Amino acid sequence: MRLKISLLKEPKHQELVSCVGWTTAEELYSCSDDHQIVKWNLLTSETSLIVKLPDDIYPIDLHWFPKSLGIKKQTQAESFVLTSSDGKFHLISKLGRVEKSVEAHCGAVLAGRWNYEGTALVTVGEDGQVKIWSKTGMLRSTLAQQGIPVYSVAWGPDSEKVLYTAGKQLIIKPLQPNAKVLQWKAHDGIILKVDWNSVNDLILSAGEDCKYKVWDSYGRVLYGSQPHEHPITSVAWAPDGELFAVGSFHTLRLCDKTGWSYALEKPNTGSIFNIAWSIDGTQIAGACGNGHVVFAHVVEQRWEWKNFQVTLTKRRTMQVRNVLNDAVDLLEFRDRVIKASLNHAHLVVSTSLQCYVFSTKNWNTPLIFDLKEGTVSLILQAERHFLLVDGGGIYLHSYEGRFISSPKFPGMRTDILNAQTVSLSNDTIAIKDKADEKIIFLFEASTGKPLGDGKLLSHKNEISEVALDQKGLTNDRKIAFIDKNRDLYITSVKRFGKEEQIIKLGTMVHTLAWCDTCNILCGLQDTRFTVWYYPNAVYVDRDILPKTLYERDASEYSKNPHIVSFVGNQVTVRRADGSLVHISISPYPAILHEYVSSSKWEDAVRLCRFVKEQSLWACLAAMAVANRDMVTAEIAYAAVGEIDKVRYINAMKDLPSRESKMAHILMFSGNIQEAETILLQAGLVYQAIQININLYNWERALELAVKYKTHVDTVLAYRQKFLETFGKQETNKRYLQYAEGLQIDWEKIKAKIEMEITKERDRSSSGQSSKNTGLKP
């Protein structure tokens, strides 16, 4: 990826350009110390003077009023705030009319920024004050006051906090009066510029120490650059938070969100005092010290999938290369390419007006449909369909171009959704809520309606990343997510009545990805690269989960690596320095998944015997129990040395009825409640009481015996035997109450138990067992 620079031979301004701002993706306004505001039209390459300001007004900062989201096409911003050296800020219309001038600070007003909703304006000045203003320019509050100038300011993603500079310090101050203020030393020189992205919640800072840095919202440094030759005078995030630009003397740099540099350009611009990204994130404009306005387009973005490599060579041209035979195809587009995604044998490209869908089998005939709004901010793909996110909503389309659904939820803000907070599978869409980050919304892909009974997935901590598995049946669909403590959890997306368990899979997990061909999960866990060959094992046999893992040292990937993709058995990891590392994992677990999904149990056992890996046997054991194939489970558990479980499975074979076997399989997986329910529904009250006795669940055993008026003496007898074994006295009031005057006769109890078992066996053999449990013999 690099920047394609365009610079006029002669500058349009006579003095330094202090600030620039985009109205649409093709129109820019620039302000200069020559008191002129100039409009640039990039389609016609024309410039026109909008207004000449009075000679005593030297503009310093410009920010357009935020456009209303969700309106068809790109609504143009109609007014902007201009801060100036005379201590005022000016509200100016698009046509150049000064609507209002407000005395704001003593000395120059160094920066002014609208919040994301356009309901408030923050200004900072040489007098060290941070002030909040209403939309119409009425003072609401003075947020902060200090003895040194505040050079730059930025709103937090929720518009509830403000970030500003204080010499070498950065300060995050909430608007609530008594809330905690976060302050830290960020640079060794005065901080000149800051920016805070609403999508990734990361902070940029630039200082006179010639460095730029990336921070999280807690003030932890994620990246610090090497010192440059000159002070860094400007930084700016791309709207989607994936890239940022850095400006210095004769220097323009394009960087990834993690800090490493994609491209360095050395245009003849003087210092770049201000950088603005276009609304679609494809180009930047810089305000230059020598009167120029520099424009740069982001080109040579690259997408890879299996043997295909797609490169954006020009704004409207892509090159597709098949690395197997070196065949090259050129794709021409009518409009500028904004976003693209290559996955699941399809390339999806959005331009400013249309969406193109190419199949990797045929690059010549794309499917084309018009977009509701021009600026697509996110494309996600699944095997059967893909998701587009723009300012107006979320839209699901098939690869034939057919519109499928558009999920909606209260307070939806599409401008802050990214690949970490939205996940797509063949039947489900998962979206993390921004208002309450502990909640995940789950939707049916086919209808866009909430999944199941409409219950939300709620967690005890804030969630940072979500991912749906890609294969298998809808009822078995799982979602994995990482919370703010870096713990990895897994749960079922099926939300009918009973609350599904959320189970922890790992700790200190930084990034995760599901395989696209089978339900294998991988993640970078502290200093380890971990692959969960069968994550579903947590619901079947939690004890065997550690044996189903593959782990290797990940210290070679340095700090903060990120998993880019997991295709087949190939995992691609992006290191902190920007380099890509490919990791190959064993292909056998994927083959095992395929055999099991086709119920080819003999082939699965044969594969495990051939490979002779404990992790594969452990996976097969858990898969067999999940699919109620206890013959295969017995073989697999024996292979991993779990003799106690082999004996338990053997004991199940002697159980008199299918219901009892089913109940004991559920108990084997830890589902005690379901096991008891199955027995009670089948009328096997004694068996239900006995499993509670075996688990020392005395309260429940007595409760069932009393409720069904049977085997009270059996429960009391086993309780007495238990107390005698441990040399204890009875203290439970209910047991004391029922034991009064009851003579325990073990002969009678054993005869009654034998009768129950005989009755159950007879009923089973005569075919009266009404419920088919789907149990494999």
Curated annotation (Swiss-Prot):
A Gene Ontology BP annotation from the UniProt entry: bone mineralization involved in bone maturation
Subcellular location(s) of the protein: Cytoplasm; Cytoplasm, Cytoskeleton, Cilium basal body; Cytoplasm, Cytoskeleton, Cilium axoneme
Disordered, as annotated region: 758-777
Pfam family, one: TPR_IFT80_172
Compositionally biased intervals (Polar residues): 765-777
Entry GO CC: 9+0 non-motile cilium; centrosome; ciliary basal body; cilium; cytoplasm; intraciliary transport particle B
WD repeat copies, ranges: 12-50, 104-143, 145-185, 186-225, 227-265, 267-306, 504-542
Source domain of life: Eukaryota
Signal peptide: none
Key words, A-Z: Cell projection, Cilium, Cytoplasm, Cytoskeleton, Repeat, WD repeat
Physiological role: Component of the intraflagellar transport (IFT) complex B, which is essential for the development and maintenance of motile and sensory cilia.
Subunit note: Component of the IFT complex B, at least composed of IFT20, IFT22, IFT25, IFT27, IFT46, IFT52, TRAF3IP1/IFT54, IFT57, IFT74, IFT80, IFT81, and IFT88. Interacts with IFT88. Interacts with IFT57 and IFT70B.
UniProt protein name: Intraflagellar transport protein 80 homolog
Organism: Rattus norvegicus
